[in-house]
């Protein structure tokens, strides 16, 4: 028992000493990323014993690579240069456009986050740093920033899903002024991709900032945004429910033996019932939209097909969609949805599915829009698609 006590105390003291070292300013403190006046950026990391230090980020040139059998674009790795006192640096070749960017280091072959940058996001099990190049109104850098505009509120609430046998968590954005009025609002259901959760669109997706800024600039109507957890075996994000601190995975299950009692589309009425009974929402297809990225695009397709009288606006972003899904859509298109958007990056490893699906929609004579952009399976594209979609809603 004494050995355990002293081991724990040693760990505590060591951790406390490290924290005090940072508080007292005796650790190496660097400005990284260092955004210059011309919007070029310098990255720095202290690695005095390293042999090689490299950097990758979505602001760097991309090259074609094989990703688990799918051909896609990925950013290159660049070498950082060692300077004095063991500090390695890299400066971009020129200014970066206003946008939200992510990056990471590789020190002697091992991935590292930037210890000088506290802003990080998790994509399944991978953590990367991010930074924002701000810009003029209307630019991505402006739309993803926290500007001096009226702000909505975000709450994470729990609702009962008898279909899944779980008490589940959902993130809900209410627009500016919601608390001070009796007005009712239309609803957008916004779905994440595989490996994500109810936090994803709020973290690197910047959904609340996008909605605040779009509403403030008149580009979008005030609306409630519902961001569910799309993993039928999970109640909430890893570590935020009673399954404990488990590792995130593509399936979203806390362990491989976990089986879902139903699918997310089958359980959707549980969520809609909660939203419509706890929030001031305008009901009906003309006041209800749904969109999602990747797996969430598949959930959007399946859910809107399963409940064709519920949705008037549908958006599939790099969606997990397939040509044979088209056979399920006749009841939905008989209701004449106002918007049916299919969006994807031309370098996305699953772009062919979106292209083929759009061709099948056209062959059936189903009214729809397509949005093909540069880039791959990335948040840069999905944030843009959300803005394009949100601007068309409820008008």
Locate the predicted segments by residue.
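Low-complexity, intrinsically disordered/propeptide-like segments
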Residues: 8-9, 14-15, 26, 33, ...
